[in-house]
Amino acid sequence: MIWLWSEYFRAIPHLQQSGVLKNFALETEGDFSGQYQVVAKRYYSPDRRVIHPAAPVVGHFNDLAYVSNIDLLLAKDVFSSSEQAKTVDFEQTQRCYQFQLASTSPLAAQQVIANTLNISAIAASEQIAQRLRRVKAGQRIVLRGEWVKVRSVSTGQYFQINHYPLPANNCRIVRVQQHELLGAKATEFP
């Protein structure tokens, strides 16, 4: 029970916290928007523990989890509402996803890749961070923001989240500027 409460009240960093932009630089790559069903949500923690993830000290926080500690696995509405979607088993490893098709699945791997997306979300504000924290699998949402590249200010290193054979566009970092919850829960994924 304690774990559930800690997940429910987990803090999500956002760009209005003083230490976040002192330690990370964001470079916009383009606009992002879409209507999706949330397949899964996963939290990440940095490799080492500190008192506060957005400390104003520059250079001590070289882990992407200090600016983005939540990933969302999303499916396009057309795909998520189909019975075929239930024949796909998703697994999130590290900061990206992998999938396995059931032997009876009529889908091809390319169809799954074309209709799914894993984002490492960066909240633009405290309000967006609170909304992202409340997101649940099965909900239909609209997200708007920007594709971004994240660089550590102290090392100059860019953070990569896609270490798998999926196309680079399927696992990306997004600065979320707007979040809207739509209607009731849609079809559940297995």
Predicted regions, residues:
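OB-fold and OB-like single-stranded nucleic-acid-recognition modules
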Residues: M1-P190
